[in-house]
Amino acid sequence: MQGRLSVWLVKHGLVHRSLGFDYQGIETLQIKPEDWHSIAVILYVYGYNYLRSQCAYDVAPGGLLASVYHLTRIEYGVDQPEEVCIKVFAPRSNPRIPSVFWVWKSSDFQERESYDMLGISYENHPRLKRILMPESWIGWPLRKDYIAPNFYEIQDAH
């Protein structure tokens, strides 16, 4: 079953895959990494001008990595927001997804955290570097195949 946004995207020839609806009735769409930036700009112009959150997760050990965007469109009033969830999957061997920083500035720290924890490289992000872990940290702690080091260096909080 396709939702309103999916029907609109099909009508305008924009490639995507409908993943159905979540428990709150929010439509979920899958977009290919190579199509994501242009579709993000189109969604912004269409009225999805609020990025509620961006997160990422490891789908399965050795499998794909996912970057998830929750967008909101307020057209008819604050009490009737239209929401959509976008998922962009990337191979773990070279996880590259276009950054949407220039579309939604609020994605700045969120994309950096996804990079820091899962190693997803957000192309054209102006400051893509670690945000939680030290720059010297090796590996991506939230990947399911991550092997934690057997020691941790404790640093002073000065």
Swiss-Prot record:
User: According to its UniProt record, which reaction does this protein catalyse?
Assistant: a plastoquinone + NADH + (n+1) H(+)(in) = a plastoquinol + NAD(+) + n H(+)(out); a plastoquinone + NADPH + (n+1) H(+)(in) = a plastoquinol + NADP(+) + n H(+)(out)
Protein's membrane topology? Peripheral membrane protein
The GO molecular function terms of this record are: NADH dehydrogenase (ubiquinone) activity; quinone binding
What InterPro entries does the record tag this protein with? NADH_DH_suC, NADH_quin_OxRdtase_su_C/D-like, NADH_UbQ_OxRdtase_30kDa_su, NADH_UbQ_OxRdtase_CS
According to the UniProt record, what class of enzyme is this? Answer: translocase
Subcellular localization: Plastid, Chloroplast thylakoid membrane
Chloroplast: is it a keyword of this entry? yes
Q: What is its EC number?
A: 7.1.1.-
Q: Which GO terms describe its biological process?
A: photosynthesis, light reaction
| Gene3D superfamilies the record matches | NADH:ubiquinone oxidoreductase, 30kDa subunit (3.30.460.80)
Q: Does the keyword ATP-binding apply?
A: no
The record's listing under PROSITE patterns reads: COMPLEX1_30K
Any one Gene Ontology cellular component term annotated for this protein: chloroplast thylakoid membrane
Kindly state which keywords UniProt assigns to this record, in alphabetical order.
Answer: Chloroplast, Membrane, NAD, NADP, Plastid, Plastoquinone, Quinone, Thylakoid, Translocase, Transport
Q: Name any one Pfam family assigned in the record.
A: Complex1_30kDa
Q: What family does this chain come from, according to its entry?
A: Belongs to the complex I 30 kDa subunit family.
Could you describe the subunit structure of this protein? NDH is composed of at least 16 different subunits, 5 of which are encoded in the nucleus.
This chain's function reads: NDH shuttles electrons from NAD(P)H:plastoquinone, via FMN and iron-sulfur (Fe-S) centers, to quinones in the photosynthetic chain and possibly in a chloroplast respiratory chain. The immediate electron acceptor for the enzyme in this species is believed to be plastoquinone. Couples the redox reaction to proton translocation, and thus conserves the redox energy in a proton gradient.
Q: What is this protein called?
A: NAD(P)H-quinone oxidoreductase subunit J, chloroplastic
Q: What species is this protein from?
A: Gossypium hirsutum
